[in-house]
Amino acid sequence: MITGPISNLSGESGFENVFIFISDSLRYDALPERIRSKGLTIKTIAAAPWTASSIPSLMSGKYPSSHNVWMFEDRLPQRPPLLSEQEDWDAGFDSEKHWLKFESSEKPPVKMLRLDGEQKLADIEPPFVHVVHDLGPHAPYGFENDEYETGPYFRDYNDPKDLQQKYQNDAEKSANYFLEILDKLENLGLREDTLCVFTSDHGELLGEGGRLGGKWGHSTPLCPELLEVPMTFIGKGIPKGETLSGVASGVDLAPTCLSAVGREIGHVDGIDLWAETPDEDRRVRSDVWQRYNAFGRELPVYVASGLWDNDGGWVKHRRSKLLRMAYYGYDVFLGDYAPPARSTTGISELVSGLKFWGRDWEKFGNTTISLQEAQKELSDELVRSEDSVELSEEQTEHLEALGYV
């Protein structure tokens, strides 16, 4: 474990380019050793437990409670500075192995971030920032998303141990893709001048028992398994195989990368890890506002906020207790992930899960944050996005196939 701003640890004044690789659904404890050994890793708390809110946070440096992007139909107010093209700055976003049933310009991250479309690494010139959003170990495990729909997949493949192994195999597969891109940068003569970052938008539940109730997948609830993700920095001079002390947030990614290339950071919720050291008692936030359309109306089935330090945190459940509990029951018995959940959700898990989903406050780990401090920090009300669009029937069907809606 080492301490200090990344710039001091690397001995470098900065980089010309940035390459960010987002491996979807990759938990901190599933980070392949091949990635960890190449750079400096810090445990990171995702800003949200699913893509719709976490990708906007990664790219903007703002918590969901600031940018108000909760669902896939919501939009950031403007393109984030990290991805804003300027005369002397090329920005690209590529998800060629994700969202395979969508046209490039209609892919959810492209729309949420207000981009015009995707760009390939070969199409951009230095100086640049290039972001790859990879499928990673996202369900359905072991298959591309254009081959299997999540629901039918889990009816065919529902052995918990086999699924957990497939998940880890997909993490390794995602690492291979990342390393292939590093080789491309090397062959193009760009590796030495590029800060490379391997991270994830959120984690994944793999049938954990106790209060998590044997649940699979992501989106809900707020818990360490869905929020603790890796952030590994790789580049010239950056220590290899080391862990950076403290806790980071997904909202630190944008300011850190902008600082490393000497760009203006602007107003963000995160800190600049390139030039700053996280405080030992740092607290970071996470939020989720999961909505579901049923019976001709929109239901806030899971709304929550969390406050975390390096040892745990508190979760504040908002809105209807009955809706939360009902949504948990739906997930484990009727939802796309129900087949494996039936194997990991016994009576004790069901009772524990219902109790957790029903409580207003829940403590995780050995956090030094008191309940009173959490209540004060999370006393604000969450606000709906002012900029949303209606998804087409085809878009909704594609998102349903991926288990999102």
UniProtKB/Swiss-Prot annotation:
Required cofactor names: Ca(2+)
InterPro entries for the chain: Alkaline_phosphatase_core_sf, Sulfatase, Sulfatase_N
Knocked-out gene: effects: Impaired formation of the tetrasaccharide present at 'Asn-532' of S-layer glycoprotein Csg with formation of a tetrasaccharide that is not sulfated. No effect on 'Asn-47' and 'Asn-117' glycosylation of S-layer glycoprotein Csg.
Pfam families registered for this protein in UniProt: Sulfatase
SUPFAM superfamilies the UniProt entry points to: Alkaline phosphatase-like
Pathway linked to the protein: Protein modification; protein glycosylation; Cell surface structure biogenesis; S-layer biogenesis
GO BP terms, alphabetized: protein glycosylation; S-layer organization
Molecular functions per Gene Ontology: arylsulfatase activity; metal ion binding; transferase activity
Keyword terms, alphabetized: Calcium, Metal-binding, Transferase
Enzyme Commission designation: 2.8.2.-
Signal peptide positions on this chain: none
Function: Involved in N-glycan biosynthetic pathway that takes place under low-salt conditions (1.75 M instead of 3.4 M). Participates in the formation of the tetrasaccharide present at 'Asn-532' of S-layer glycoprotein Csg, consisting of a sulfated hexose, 2 hexoses and rhamnose. Mediates sulfation of sugar 1 in the tetrasaccharide.
Family: Belongs to the sulfatase family.
Name this polypeptide is given: Low-salt glycan biosynthesis sulfotransferase Agl7
Annotated source species: Haloferax volcanii (strain ATCC 29605 / DSM 3757 / JCM 8879 / NBRC 14742 / NCIMB 2012 / VKM B-1768 / DS2) (Halobacterium volcanii)
